[in-house]
A protein has these predicted regions:
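Alpha-helical segment proximal to the catalytic Tyr-Lys
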Residues: 121, 165-166
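C-terminal helical subdomain
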Residues: 176-180, 195-243, 247
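Conserved glycine-rich cofactor-binding loop
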Residues: 17-18
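Substrate-binding pocket helix/loop in short-chain dehydrogenase/reductase
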Residues: 91-93, 100-102
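The beta1-alpha1 cofactor-binding region of Rossmann-like NAD(H)/NADP(H)-dependent oxidoreductases
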Residues: 58-69, 98
Length: 251
């Protein structure tokens, strides 16, 4: 596959098949970007690309060859949104599942590294590049039974913040967005499709929705080139920290 003519600024969004990624792709398309929607689920991103006038690129961020192929298909990149990620399991360290930990590390940390490294030359060449990495408040806090996810998100955040210094003087801005509770497929994936456990995460609160985070990404992308928003934390009003909520109904 080769990329189409790209007269507009190009935004690459990973994890674009659902949730924050899909909403971000739609938001950036409305702002005039040609969006390259990247994810593993081909049918979803192909439908999305048709609807927004973008390009669908089927790729797994944990696969070196797939990421290299992604980079080869793009002649220009102005914005990269590192959104692919997720959690698996909720267990104490003593009962940690190493396969879950490996998956979280590969997807959240090495996936971000692969894509960023592959597209960085094009972002620099754009003359006004932007890298947005969607981490989590789990990149800033810890909570019981969540060490696998918080460790991966801390590492992802450290990667992004380190790059901020390494690119000082280059024409690339970097913004980390750390959401709290967002009602997407996140909890369903974490609990291996257990609808009841996933629903309980949001019980008694009004969580964020994907569009709330996407609007923040759009705001960041619309700032003048001299303005760098280093870190944005976005939580529901009902949430004070990763483990502290005000739940209606007494839960």
């Amino acid at each position: 596959m080769t990329s189409p003519e790209q007269p507009h600024r190009v935004a690459v969004v990973t994890g674009a098949s659902s949730g924050i990624g899909e909403a971000t792709a739609r938001t950036l398309a409305r702002q005039g970007f040609h969006v390259a929607a990247v994810a593993r689920r081909a049918e979803r991103i192909q439908t999305l690309a048709r609807e927004i006038g973008g390009t669908a690129i089927v790729a797994d961020v944990t696969d070196d060859a797939a990421v290299d192929a992604l980079a080869a298909q793009l002649s220009r990149v102005d914005v990269l949104v590192n959104n692919a990620g997720g959690a698996r399991g909720l267990a104490p360290v003593a009962d940690a599942d190493l396969e879950d930990w490996r998956w979280m590390w590969e997807t959240n940390v090495l996936g971000t590294l692969r894509v960023t490294r592959a597209l960085l030359p094009k972002l620099v060449d754009s003359g006004d590049g932007l890298i947005v990495t969607v981490t989590s408040i789990a990149a800033l806090e810890t909570y019981d039974n969540g060490a696998g996810y918080t460790a991966a998100k801390h590492a992802q955040g450290a990667l992004h913040r380190t790059l901020r210094g390494e690119l000082l003087g280059k024409p690339v801005r970097l913004t980390e967005i750390a959401p709290g509770a967002v009602q997407t497929e996140f909890s369903l994936v974490r609990f291996d499709g257990d609808q009841k456990r996933a629903a309980a995460v949001y019980e008694g609160i009004t969580p964020l929705v994907a569009e709330d985070v996407a609007e923040v990404v759009g705001f960041v992308a619309s700032r003048p080139s001299h303005v760098n928003l280093d870190l944005i934390v976005i939580r529901p009003r009902d949430q004070a920290s990763a483990s502290r909520f005000s739940r209606r109904g007494g839960r």
